[in-house]
């Protein structure tokens, strides 16, 4: 739907919280006043658990990746603070502005007993969340980890993106909200894919530095491996230059929307489920801090017969 940012209109893909299946959480006591982010997140994580009823929630950890956090309640809280004064800044709203609050709601409602951790950064923090999950499993802290990326939209984002010059004439920047989640565990025969390489922590402060960071990050991977097309906004031009000599793969259909860490989750799922490539590099082009990437390989059983 179109959303206004100042005098400008932009296409935004939003979630209707009043329809199934998302609305099943609206009347839960803990979630009645929770942020939209909490509702996006719990639905994604609940679907992940429901797909594997055989695992023990007490031995499941959760790592959340967020770029913006609980925007709607943050705006309402600070608007009350700035317009009506400190004594009108509602203490009911403040807890819902904390970035770890949505995960707290989720694990309490779903009975998840393992460690819980929130990673905050641009889109690339999804890769750091995957690394954290892999370390937990390697250390024996848990049997499985759900890694989730989630974002909620608030119209002030549009003004911020204009100020940052993220809306470009050459690359339309379509925004989305939502959540996605993946379940990570030890290697088993029924796994659809595996993470075979992680490269993260390639930081930048300017767009010219971003190109160098991207070059160094992608240099960690085999030059002959196909690369998923995931770049948006100004990063799309940098990515096109860097990947001109590599096989670029587009898996999403229709206009590409950027849900930031939610899109990172969706792209990871697409890469794991595709059947055309034995391995696929999935870059995560942060627009403000870092560039990171993951190599996802199909298991031998699931690659067999791929066309």
Whereabouts are the PLM-identified features?
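Structural signature of cysteine-dependent C-C bond-forming condensing enzymes
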Residues: 51-65, 77-91, 112-115, 138-146, ...
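Condensing-enzyme catalytic core mediating Claisen C-C bond formation in acyl metabolism
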Residues: 1-20, 159-229, 277-279, 285-307
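Conserved beta-ketoacyl condensing-enzyme motif
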Residues: 4-110, 114, 217-248
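Active-site-proximal alpha-helical scaffold in enzymes
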Residues: 41-46, 51, 102, 109-110, ...
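Active-site pocket-shaping loop/turn-to-helix segments
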Residues: 25-43, 91-95, 116-128, 169-180, ...
């Amino acid at each position: 739907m179109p959303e206004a940012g100042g005098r400008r209109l932009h296409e935004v893909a939003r979630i209707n919280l009043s329809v199934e299946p998302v609305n099943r959480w609206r009347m839960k006591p803990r979630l009645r006043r929770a942020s939209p982010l909490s509702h996006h997140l719990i639905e994604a994580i609940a679907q992940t658990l429901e797909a594997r009823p055989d695992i023990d929630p007490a031995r499941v950890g959760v790592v959340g990746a967020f770029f913006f956090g609980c925007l709607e309640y943050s705006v309402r809280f600070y608007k009350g603070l700035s317009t009506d004064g400190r004594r009108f800044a509602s203490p009911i709203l403040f807890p819902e502005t904390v970035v770890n609050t949505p995960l707290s709601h989720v694990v309490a409602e779903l009975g998840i007993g393992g460690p819980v951790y929130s990673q905050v950064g641009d889109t690339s923090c999804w890769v750091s969340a995957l690394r954290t999950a892999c370390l937990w499993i390697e250390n024996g802290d848990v049997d499985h980890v759900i890694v989730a990326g989630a974002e909620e939209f608030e119209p002030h984002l549009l003004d911020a993106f204009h100020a940052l010059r993220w809306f470009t004439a050459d690359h339309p920047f379509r925004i989305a909200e939502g959540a996605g989640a993946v379940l990570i565990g030890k290697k088993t025969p029924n796994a659809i894919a595996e993470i075979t390489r992680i490269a993260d922590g390639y930081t930048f402060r300017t767009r010219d530095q971003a190109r160098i960071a991207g070059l160094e990050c992608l240099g960690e991977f085999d030059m002959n491996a196909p690369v998923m097309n995931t770049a948006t906004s100004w990063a799309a031009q940098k990515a096109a230059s860097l990947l001109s000599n590599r096989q670029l793969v587009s898996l999403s259909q229709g206009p590409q929307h950027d849900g930031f860490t939610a899109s990172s989750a969706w792209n990871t799922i697409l890469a794991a489920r595709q059947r055309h490539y034995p391995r696929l590099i999935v870059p995560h082009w942060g627009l403000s801090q870092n560039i990171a990437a993951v190599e996802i390989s199909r298991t031998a059983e699931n690659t067999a017969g791929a066309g």
